[in-house]
UniProtKB/Swiss-Prot annotation:
UniProt cross-references to SMART domains, sorted A to Z: Alpha_adaptinC2, B2-adapt-app_C
PANTHER family documented for this protein: ADAPTOR COMPLEX SUBUNIT BETA FAMILY MEMBER
HEAT repeat windows: 45-82, 117-154, 156-193, 273-313, 384-421, 458-495
UniProt GO MF annotations: clathrin binding
Pfam families the record matches: Adaptin_N, Alpha_adaptinC2, B2-adapt-app_C
Gene encoding the protein: ap1b1
Location, primary (coarse class): Golgi
Cell compartments where the protein resides: Golgi apparatus, trans-Golgi network; Cytoplasmic vesicle, Clathrin-coated vesicle membrane
Listed name of the protein: AP-1 complex subunit beta
């Protein structure tokens, strides 16, 4: 009879009977009883009261019974650590048993029991097991070290287990080597210092073990080889030759791991013929992945996507294997389309377009859209194929299938941008399908085409006017594009669009709740009212040509993902530390010993820049405007306030989003962030019946104005709740605020609100729990600013998430939600140090508190001045700067509300678009979060 019988009894008094059976002198009865206990435990019954009785069964030579008892102990030891200690003597005795299976079982079980009391007694048995004569015991003990490190890292380091593990890399048994590699790799990923380093001494040992260990052991060893950088081209070639046979393995994981090693080592090979040889060897196993189950196909395709971006020559002749089959799942088809676009070239474009055209007639709407868009991407990628792509798109438009037509128009808009004034002859065909457009992106694309080529479309004003009639009901994307296109039409044909432009500007600035639309409306308003020719120069300027977007990963990220082939990172196309909790903030290794250069005079000091940073300079109508007050040390003296520009000055408007820009005359001072957002100025009152635009006078900037706040929906996003809450934390004029927008989605009005913060890492709470806002009627919303109190103390573990509750009074109805608190809000306006104080403080902070991390600057070019202005706007102040060829080094300081200083050195490498950030602080626990925010600031993402 099978073991299923143990799951079928549920009678009263069962526990008592089990106790009796566990006390039996017969081993077969004990074994049956323990099986029943395990079965009850498996289905969720509490059998912890039998702990002592089961523990007594450990004293046996029956291996099956011992395994069952160990399983029970592992399950309940965490909840009963005081009882688990009773098993230590038996574990230690079993760890020295003559039977290697029992020795290994004892060590494995002790490693799985995550209780401090047990781990203290594990050290000696583990040390003996690591040096055991039997390889089975050694390989089990190697894995146990990683488990022990997860519970108590210091214990593992102090006991010297890491050194023993490194010695096991030279073990005669390949499985011991593989397990030692796996254990060291896992420890190295979460350790703050390097514990696993491959060098020429152990490289050959790993390669020798590669041929003899199991398939998963091969995966561990292959992955570890990616940590090694070959000394020269010959060594890289030798390693590739040893790894290449693994490409023929039946296990897909082994194949992908071998591909990963080859992809890395080929970068070090100087002989192009050898590289071509290895590329040729990699193609068949990658193609074989596409003949496996759909799930493995998908994983293979995601990895192939990265490989093709890095080395397209590997699969350049394998286009046909990526053609979609009728029975492929949709997720496989989508990935195949991406790779087909990457591999498309002038030689194969004809057959690729025939495939895409065929896909565009299928039933699945999303797949059809992707296929149509793929045709457009091929047109942008391959200049000589653009005309053929246009013809295919026109053929698809003739099918009159609604979603095909709309997607084709979206794609043709991009082709027009890539090839201006080349295919305008098809505009009439596009306009004939105007009435079938119902999707926002398709409408916006058609409106863009009409506005861009308004001078060639006789009835352009009529077409745009038809969209203007339903302006208020349109999507914001359509509204923004319609506004821009009508302004373009007015600049090209003023007589036809004069009334229209007045109407659209009025709708955008006076009757819209969309801040983006209002901002753009005010920009156009002032341009048109100030200088017609200047407006034409800006709005109708020559636009940059769009480029091929097939390779959407920047090179640094791609190189990192190549080293993570066959892992989850290669599927997500994200670095591991972005989604693996243990790795977040732990890639900050490589702490360098700071040279004595800090004691020397800097090579270059920008005195003008230092002076411009002094005092509180008046900010003018821009994003992130703040006055600098209460400066320290040599920065007490204030500069005179800069002269404000005249109202309506076109030169000061940031119009880069409109496709054109005029020279910027603003002084390049960090204290003066002229990133004007058109929120502070308000238009003058006008007579709506006026037929000219003289009423569009520009307003002048006033005092310090808070930037518009980008609120995020944090509760009730689907409007299924009684209220929708959007919000964001801000810092303005030295105060932390919580900006909320409350939307009443219930069936009755709301009059009074109360907010509560639960205990959090930053010690923040609302200054007044009762919100100062009026009643909110059904369907209405209101904005409210909540001053935040901060006790200044940051507690550990640091968690940026704040738990909150909103209460509606007097009904007492509560709504619970969470918000992320940005650490930058804690940085005060008094965080600037003078140079002497900076050097003195740097030396006083222990070297152990120094951190170093390399930040990839994902901007078109490294504009150090612009980056430092952004940092200054967030109260991260530059002290001094040093310049060298292709490098600029800036020293900065900032201070939190709790008076914790953070000292930073940013070394910008202009040639590699990187920034090395070294920092010191007396509170290192906050640095992982601070470095994350610094990365976003440098890359202009916040």
């Amino acid at each position: 009879m099978s073991d299923s019988k143990y799951f079928q009894t549920t009678k009263k008094g069962e526990i008592h009977e089990l106790k009796e059976e566990l006390l039996s002198q017969r081993e077969d009865k004990k074994k049956e009883a323990v099986k029943k206990v395990i079965a009850a435990m498996t289905v969720g019954k509490d059998v912890s009261m039998l702990f002592t009785h089961v523990l007594n069964c450990m004293q046996t030579h029956n291996l099956e019974l011992k395994k069952l008892v160990y399983l029970y102990v592992m399950n309940y030891a965490k909840n009963h650590p005081d009882r688990a200690i009773l098993a230590v003597n038996t574990f230690q005795k079993d760890a020295s048993d003559p039977n290697p299976l029992i020795r290994a079982l004892a060590v494995r079980t002790m490693g799985c029991i995550r209780v401090d009391n047990i781990t203290e007694h594990l050290c000696e048995p583990l040390r003996h097991a690591l040096k055991d004569q039997d390889p089975y015991v050694r390989k089990t003990a190697a894995v146990c070290v990683a488990k022990l490190y997860d519970v108590n890292p210091e214990l593992v380091e102090n006991q010297g287990f890491l050194n023993i593990l490194n010695d096991l890399l030279g073990d005669s048994n390949p499985m011991v080597v593989a397990n030692a590699v796996a254990s060291l790799t896992e420890i190295d990923e979460v350790s703050k210092k390097e514990v696993f380093r491959i060098h020429s001494g152990n490289l050959n040992k790993l390669l020798a073990a590669l041929n003899e260990c199991t398939e998963w052991g091969q995966v561990f060893i292959l992955n570890s080889l990616c940590k090694y950088t070959p000394r020269d081209s010959q060594e890289a070639e030798n390693v590739c030759e040893r790894v290449a046979p693994r490409l023929q393995h039946a296990n897909s994981a082994v194949v992908l791991s071998a591909v990963k090693v080859l992809m890395k080592y080929m970068n070090s090979i100087g002989n192009n013929d050898v590289i071509r040889l290895f590329c040729k060897k990699m193609a068949p196993p990658l193609v074989t992945l596409l003949s496996k189950e759909p799930e493995i196909q998908f994983l293979g395709l995601r990895n192939i996507n990265l490989i093709v971006q890095k080395r397209p020559e590997i699969l350049q002749y394998e286009m046909k294997v990526f053609f979609c089959k009728y029975n492929d799942p949709i997720y496989v088809k989508m990935e195949k389309l991406e790779i087909m676009i990457m591999l498309a070239n002038e030689k194969n474009i004809e057959e690729v377009l025939l495939e895409f055209k065929e896909y565009a007639t299928e039933i699945d709407v999303e797949f059809v859209r992707k296929a149509v868009r793929a045709i457009g991407r091929c047109a942008i990628k391959i200049d000589r194929a653009s005309e053929r792509c246009i013809q295919v798109l026109l053929d698809l438009i003739q099918t009159k299938v609604n979603y095909v037509v709309q997607e084709a128009i979206i794609v043709i808009k991009d082709i027009f941008r890539k090839y201006p004034n080349k295919y305008e002859g098809i505009i009439a065909t596009l306009c004939a399908n105007l009435e079938s457009l119902d999707e926002p992106e398709a409408k916006a694309s058609m409106i863009w085409i009409i506005g861009e080529y308004a001078e060639r479309i006789d009835n352009a004003h009529e077409l745009l006017n038809s969209f203007l009639e339903g302006f208020k009901d349109e999507n914001s994307q359509v509204q923004l594009q319609l506004l821009t296109s009508i302004v373009k039409l007015f600049l090209k044909r003023p007589k036809d669009a004069q009334q229209m432009v007045q109407t659209v500007l009025n709708l955008s600035t006076q009757e819209s709740d969309n801040p983006d639309l209002r901002d753009r409306g005010f920009v156009y308003w002032r341009l048109l009212s100030t200088d017609f020719e200047a407006a034409k120069a800006v709005v109708l300027s020559e636009k940059p040509l769009i480029t091929d977007t097939t390779s959407h990963l920047d090179e640094s990220l791609l190189n990192e993902l190549i080293l993570n082939i066959s892992t989850l990172a290669s599927v997500y196309h994200k670095p591991p530390e972005t989604f693996v909790t243990k790795l977040k903030g732990l890639n900050k290794r490589g702490l360098r010993n700071k040279e004595e250069e800090d004691e020397e005079e800097p090579d270059y000091v920008d005195d003008d820049n230092m002076n411009n940073q002094q005092g509180g300079q008046q900010q003018q109508g821009g994003y992130q405007q703040q006055q600098q007050q209460q400066q320290q040390g040599g920065y007490q003296q204030q500069q005179p306030q800069q002269q404000q520009p005249k109202s309506g000055n076109l030169i000061d408007l940031d119009l880069s989003d409109l496709g054109g820009a005029l020279p910027n005359n603003n002084n390049n001072n960090y204290g003066n962030n002229n990133n004007n957002n058109m929120y502070s100025p308000q238009p003058q009152q006008f007579n709506g019946n006026s037929n000219d635009l003289s009423f569009l006078g520009g307003g002048g900037g006033g005092g310090e104005v808070q930037a518009p706040v980008n609120k995020v929906v944090v509760f009730g996003g689907d409007r299924s709740q009684a209220i929708q809450i959007s919000g964001a934390f801000t810092r303005f004029q030295g105060r932390i605020n919580l900006e909320l927008n409350l939307l009443n989605t219930s069936q009755q009005g709301m009059s009074k609100f109360k907010i509560q913060f639960y205990q959090n890492s930053f010690g923040i709470s609302p200054a007044d729990q009762i919100l100062s806002c009026g009643a909110i009627e059904v369907g209405q919303s209101t904005d409210v600013t909540i001053p935040i109190s901060c006790n200044g103390q940051i507690s550990n573990p640091l968690n940026p998430v704040i738990d909150m509750a909103m209460m509606v009074l007097p009904s007492q109805e509560r709504f619970y939600f969470k918000m992320n608190f940005p650490l930058l809000c804690l940085l005060t306006e008094t965080g600037r140090l003078d140079r002497e104080s900076y050097l003195s403080m740097w030396k006083s902070i222990p070297e152990s508190n120094e951190r170093s991390v390399e930040i990839q600057v994902r901007l078109p070019h490294v504009d150090v001045d612009s980056i430092l202005r952004r940092l200054n706007s967030k109260n991260i102040f530059e002290i001094v700067r040093k310049k060298a060829p292709n490098q600029e080094i800036s020293f900065l300081s900032c201070k939190t509300e709790s008076s914790v200083y953070i000292l930073i050195e940013l070394a910008f490498n202009i040639s590699t678009n990187t920034c090395r950030c070294s920092s010191k602080t007396t509170s290192p626990d906050i640095m992982a979060l601070f470095e994350h925010n610094l990365n976003l600031l440098i890359n202009n993402q916040i």
